[in-house]
């Protein structure tokens, strides 16, 4: 096989340019292999294999014909059930099925197969080809995977060339290479019998992204097993119910779910499976934990419909990762069809309430700040007072800085220069300490939250916190929490804390 042929190499390079390689940095390795490849034997004289058609003393080299085995897989079931026999597999048959050469009457006459059978095989091939995604280890980049592309471009027309190659690392056991001599190999059947297929699969997926070696360990398996059992138990108690009027925490959790769907979908499409799985198992759990805390603080018992809707989306996305437990949970949720047949949840930007996400983040960060102050001061609180910004100029400066930072600038000098250049914020030069703190505040936020703030209107922080802190604040800290605007006339501010309030960063007094 003359892999050194420059025209053949160039065709392969064109294929690599057009196909998706994950991770993308491995593309250069493929092209380097194509550059140095040269002649390679297509046959050998020892071992098992298929006899070379024109010389029975030789056996076809496995890395020559086997690299297009997926073409054979499209028709293997017809071989296995006896529909196709060796004597039927003539050159004319393969020319018609794989290469679209000749016509069906010639294939029928030479193969002795009925037109119906040949149509059935061709339909199967056309359904599965081209190869959507080929997954393998990095050690095969220098041989099998490169030959896979070279042989496909040599044999098949362009529309049947491979579309994607995904390269992954190896699987380690507790940080060490698996080997019989080290005694650190767990037979697959034993592992599945002891723990089930789903925990084993998820433990491997969750241990590494593409190209990284997956460090398999039993502690991870036990943890995931417990997580799946917990999800099963949780969903067993949920019933589909009509969702009534939404409260603040409802709008937040439904909006967060839309965001999670978008994140997980993107991760799966880009083969960042570890990231997608982490979001399904843990990010959702974190969101639901906060939601449960909010609901319990208000004494609500009318959220089964919302929890059912959210966990239905979660389990549908879990299904490709852990199909067995997903089907069990899906049934517990009341569905009669299989989870694997359900539609992948669709992201809808219209269903994201940006204000609810921002306001809930404000509530969470305020609670966290109170907790941190109590930890540091060791105070047993008798009174908690929150001061929110109500200075219009400070708000205007904040919005201006926000826009500058979302635009990619975060240098203090650049920010100050742009503030001074704007007639509406030019007086900001008198408050450098405030500007520095706002920049620090925004640095700590995700790009998603900052973008939401830019796109949405301001909301009344005082009104929101006054309403929502009443329940969760009392439950968390055992005292009533007062909320003032920093410029309120009737403000209680014995220590002058109010002047430190910034948008989305209230000042706090604890007595």
Question: Where in this protein do the model-derived segments appear?
Answer:
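A broad structural signal for alpha-helix termini and local helix breaks/kinks
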Residues: 156-157, 195, 322, 333-334, ...
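Secondary-structure boundary/capping signal
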Residues: 49, 199, 326, 337-338, ...
